[in-house]
A protein has these predicted regions:
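Structural transition elements
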Residues: 319-361, 380-384
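Surface-exposed binding/hinge segments that line
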Residues: 98-100, 114-177
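Ligand-site clamp/hinge motif
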Residues: 217-263
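Gly/Pro-rich hinge or "lid" segments in bacterial periplasmic/extracellular proteins
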Residues: 149, 155-225, 229, 239
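Alpha-helical secondary-structure segments
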Residues: 96-102, 148-154, 198, 227-229, ...
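Ligand/substrate-recognition segments at binding pockets and active sites
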Residues: 206-208, 360-426
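N-terminal lobe/hinge region of extracytoplasmic solute-binding protein
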Residues: 24-74, 194
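Aromatic- and charge-enriched surface segment that lines or borders ligand/interaction sites
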Residues: 68-118, 152, 289-291
Length: 426
């Protein structure tokens, strides 16, 4: 039940003499803990000062980062990463044990990491699913520090896009000794954050609306980092952000659909795939009716993704029919794993007749003629617009279906969904 997001932005031409890049954020950072963070804003900032095993190159391919080289077993189920000489910003060496600790934190039920499934369902790391379910200890996770510079990962089955997952923040390393000195304050200030990436955090506090990062002189690839630093500003009003760009206060700003029409012919306008999904998440564990497959199929076929992307977002976003969005992972041949969306459209593209057919089956199976659900949605402009159209589409196509909307700050919405305190989430 998703569609693919796209970043559209105005970008001033930068060069090595500019010093600091001034960037807009749409929302505050929710968490700087890589295993706890769930939102794109947090991931963007964490990735500015942290490197994982791999990174994405300009063509979207996975290339070495902290891992200098790697080997893949003949059966595709064992990955051995050989780490380069890299340092944390406190002078400690980045070791294989840092990755083991970070990954164990991700699957530890005590941490309730929303993206723990990246290791289990998506990454297929041995014993990840059992650990998340509380059936095995975190020490049974299929990741081993053979020595300080060698990390071995065991998978249940071959995963063709596994290397692409390595630049997702949930897979980032955490220095265990440093973490233990911070505990509950980890990731809340420059003093409780370590960098092993191109930049390091200089001033930040939770819910900050402006903060900076400076170039990390100890970064292994520092010679290739042209900027002296990054300056982030949280600007929630898109028109204010565009004005700040036009006056030179910002070097880069995101645009909404209406603004795209205004500036699309400007040579500084850029449109790039964001590699993320908008999706509707039904709480099938907490709401019995939503566990009914035919009801979920009815909802799926009642959604007109083309109308949402073309008439509401209007920013180049495209309908998506796969759980893995385009530009997110590569397949066995090195090409985009989800580039061809057309072959999946028949399973979930808009079809009012199919939606009504599945809806009637669901009503019979559940013994009900009508349904009322509540959907939580972020308090930002775009999510509210999308939610309103989703409500209209479902209520128009499915007679007797009511979708109420509850608007919450993103942090609260994320927490409610993590706690299972929701019916449907956007």
């Amino acid at each position: 039940m998703g569609f693919f997001g796209r970043y559209v932005r105005q970008t001033a031409e930068m060069n090595a003499q500019r010093g600091t890049l001034n960037i807009m954020l749409e929302t505050e950072v929710q968490s700087l803990d890589p295993q706890v963070a769930t939102d794109g804003t947090s991931f963007e900032v964490i990735a500015d000062y942290t490197d994982g095993l791999m990174q994405m190159d300009a063509d979207g391919a996975a290339v070495p980062a902290i891992a200098e080289t790697y080997d893949i077993s003949e059966d595709g189920k064992t990955y051995t990463f050989h780490l380069r000489d890299a340092k944390w910003s406190n002078g400690d060496a980045v070791t294989a044990a840092d990755f083991v600790f970070g990954w164990q934190r991700a699957v530890d039920p005590a941490n309730a990491s929303e993206y723990s499934y990246m290791l289990s369902d998506i990454g297929q790391v041995v014993n990840a699913a059992e650990i998340i379910a509380g059936e095995k200890p975190v020490t049974d996770l299929g990741v081993t520090a053979v020595d300080d510079k060698t990390l071995e990962v065991q998978l249940n089955v071959p995963v063709s896009y596994f290397l692409s997952l390595m630049y997702f923040p949930t897979f980032y390393p955490v220095n265990e000794a440093f973490f233990n000195t911070c505990k509950d304050t980890f990731g809340t200030s420059p003093d409780t954050v370590l960098s092993n990436g191109a930049f390091k955090l200089t001033d930040y506090q939770p819910a900050a609306t402006a903060f900076t990062l400076e170039k990390n002189p100890d970064y292994y690839d520092a010679a290739k980092v042209a900027l002296d630093g990054l300056a982030y500003q949280v600007i929630k009003d898109s028109q204010q952000a565009l004005m700040s760009y036009q006056t030179g206060a910002l070097d880069m700003t995101l645009l909404n659909g209406e603004q795209v029409d205004q500036v699309k012919d400007d040579p500084e306008f850029t449109s790039v795939g964001a590699g993320y999904l908008w999706y509707i998440s039904p709480n099938i564990d907490g709401v019995p009716e939503l566990a009914n497959e035919n009801l979920r199929k009815a909802i799926t076929f009642a959604l007109d993704r083309d109308a949402i992307t073309g008439d509401v977002l209007k920013d180049g976003s495209a309908p998506c029919y796969t759980a893995v969005p385009p530009q997110f992972a590569t397949g066995p041949d090195g090409s985009d794993f989800s580039a061809d969306q057309t072959k999946f459209a028949e399973f979930c593209a808009y079809d009012a007749d199919k939606a009504k057919e599945y809806y009637e089956q669901a009503k019979t199976e559940l013994g009900k003629d009508s349904f009322t659900f509540n959907m939580v949605v972020d308090a930002d402009d775009a999510p509210q617009k999308v939610a309103q159209v989703v409500k209209e589409q479902l209520e128009t196509t499915l007679a007797g279906f009511t979708l109420n909307l509850t608007v919450e700050p993103k942090k609260q919405r994320v927490q409610d969904m993590q706690d299972g305190n929701f019916e449907i989430g956007l």
